[in-house]
């Protein structure tokens, strides 16, 4: 469906150079950044201030091994996600304030994460060639959900703050380039056997497909300088996303449950937005009936406020990504979806006040 619409030659003509990828103002475009609402700037700056003296937690090998030894994944994950959430918070704080006081801690966070053996989590080590191994193999970089999320975090950090980081030393952003290339860009181009890609008949794909693809696309659009590789990566992503859409019925229903829509249909939207931005709107799939139906599913499963029909792994209450739902509705011209995003934003107002100054989730694309 998607791959058929744009062949490699068309993608080459439509996709922008990496230097021209500019979906958001960068951190050195102060006039544009400072035009954001004061309440938004204050919220992120206050959140970042909490971590000016943060001690970055180590990730002990034995905590990774816990999963194979006793089934505990949470102890490692607490440390893993803490690092990423703190870095995301500091990045947004520096982006908003622009005075440099968060940069040292941002550098500490970047360096700590770049030093990790594996950017994923123990429960996903089965994706490797040694699925029963208690530790990750440094010689086989694999792409799971959170290796992808980590790459996305570092790439958006690079995009937003490269100018400021380069003034300290260009080695910081070069390190991001090196690690993202080794862990994400090269495996994505060289391998077809990650089950989530759907390129081989290994197992049916699910939300992993658009979620991983969205972060891999982010990395190629921001970091990859070779035009041929960028074009081939986009083409491969379209083929992979076709495998995801092939498991959907015409009504766009998400068989994984409503709470998974946020990383299934919504991650498909992330992918389509990245391509839309990278082509100046010329790579556009928003008129595709199935793309529209996948978006509409979330309001068709809605009961009231934050309550949704719960089935499969879906909970009864879901805090949807309000801005994403709003933008999805705008793209497909569906006012009901737009209104749902607006309603969710107002419903979540009290929660935003309650957690003002708290840590920001690591997915920077969703925050931007």
Q: Where are the model-predicted features located?
A:
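Non-membrane alpha-helical segments in proteins
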Residues: 82-96, 108-112, 148-159
């Amino acid at each position: 469906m998607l791959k058929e619409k744009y062949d490699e030659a068309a993608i080459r003509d439509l996709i922008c150079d990496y230097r021209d990828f500019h979906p958001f103002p960068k951190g050195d475009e102060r006039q544009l950044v400072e035009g954001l609402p004061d309440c938004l700037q204050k919220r992120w700056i206050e959140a970042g201030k909490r971590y000016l003296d943060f001690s970055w937690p180590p990730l002990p090998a034995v905590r990774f091994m816990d999963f194979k030894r006793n089934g505990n994944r949470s102890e490692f994950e607490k440390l893993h996600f803490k690092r990423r959430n703190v870095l995301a918070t500091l990045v947004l704080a520096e982006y908003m304030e622009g005075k440099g006081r968060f940069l040292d801690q941002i550098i500490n966070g970047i360096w700590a994460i770049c030093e990790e053996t594996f950017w994923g989590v123990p429960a996903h080590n089965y994706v490797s060639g040694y699925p029963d191994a208690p530790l990750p193999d440094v010689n086989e970089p694999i792409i799971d959900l959170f290796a992808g999320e980590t790459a996305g975090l570092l790439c958006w950090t690079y995009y937003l703050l490269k100018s400021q980081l380069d003034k300290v030393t260009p080695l910081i952003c070069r390190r991001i380039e090196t690690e993202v290339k080794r862990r994400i860009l090269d495996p994505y181009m060289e391998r077809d056997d990650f089950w989530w890609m759907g390129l081989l008949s290994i197992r049916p794909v699910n939300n992993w497909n658009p979620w991983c693809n969205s972060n891999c696309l982010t990395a190629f659009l921001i970091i990859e300088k070779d035009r041929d590789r960028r074009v081939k990566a986009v083409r491969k992503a379209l083929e992979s996303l076709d495998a995801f859409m092939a498991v959907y019925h015409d009504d766009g229903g998400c068989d994984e449950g409503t709470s998974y829509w946020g990383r299934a249909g919504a991650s498909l939207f992330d992918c389509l937005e990245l391509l839309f931005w990278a082509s100046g709107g010329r790579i556009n799939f928003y008129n595709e009936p199935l793309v529209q139906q996948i978006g509409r599913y979330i309001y068709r499963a809605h009961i009231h406020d934050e309550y949704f029909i719960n089935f499969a792994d879906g909970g009864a209450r879901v805090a949807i990504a309000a801005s994403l739902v709003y933008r999805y509705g705008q793209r497909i011209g569906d006012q009901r979806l737009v209104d749902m995003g607006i309603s969710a934003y107002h419903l979540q107002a009290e929660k935003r006040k309650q957690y003002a100054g708290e840590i920001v989730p690591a997915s920077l694309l969703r925050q931007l």
